[in-house]
């Protein structure tokens, strides 16, 4: 068991992505087609996390032309260039699978979490 943790620690890059379930994020990732390499972005709401050590993944959902599209991204994947948090969401669940049943504007509607900065005098 100790050997597994040692290998996971070597392959883990710094987890610079700080976001939670309910946040609206934009993931920029590499697509390699033959010898060409380009960047593509996917923007949506984080529905869930699967915590499996180095195999940690997150699921993003967006509505494209009235159809729900979901994509799973591995957190420690080398193809992910960056993850931008566009909006912080306020939710009370760890898995937002109920969003799949929503239609129209309600499918992307989540309350925004306000962040208050403390000012030192």
Swiss-Prot record:
Transmembrane segments: none annotated. It comes from the Bacteria. Keywords: Ribonucleoprotein, Ribosomal protein. GO terms for molecular function: structural constituent of ribosome. Pfam families: Ribosomal_L19. GO terms for cellular component: cytosolic large ribosomal subunit. The keyword Lipid metabolism does not apply. One of its GO terms (biological process) is translation. PANTHER family: LARGE RIBOSOMAL SUBUNIT PROTEIN BL19M, RIBOSOMAL PROTEIN L19. This protein is located at the 30S-50S ribosomal subunit interface and may play a role in the structure and function of the aminoacyl-tRNA binding site. Belongs to the bacterial ribosomal protein bL19 family. This is Large ribosomal subunit protein bL19. The lineage of its organism: Bacteria, Pseudomonadati, Spirochaetota, Spirochaetia, Spirochaetales. The gene is rplS.
């Amino acid at each position: 068991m100790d050997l597994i943790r040692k290998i996971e620690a070597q392959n883990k890059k710094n987890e610079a992505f700080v976001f939670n379930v309910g946040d609206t994020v934009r993931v920029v990732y590499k697509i390699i087609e033959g010898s060409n390499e380009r960047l593509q972005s996917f923007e949506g709401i984080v529905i869930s996390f699967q915590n499996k050590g180095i195999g940690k993944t997150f699921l993003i959902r967006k509505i494209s032309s009235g159809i729900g599209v979901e994509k799973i991204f591995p957190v420690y994947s080398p193809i992910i260039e960056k993850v931008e948090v566009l909006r912080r969401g306020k939710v009370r669940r760890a898995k937002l699978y109920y969003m799949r049943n929503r239609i129209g504007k309600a499918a992307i509607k989540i309350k925004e979490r306000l962040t208050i900065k403390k000012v030192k005098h």
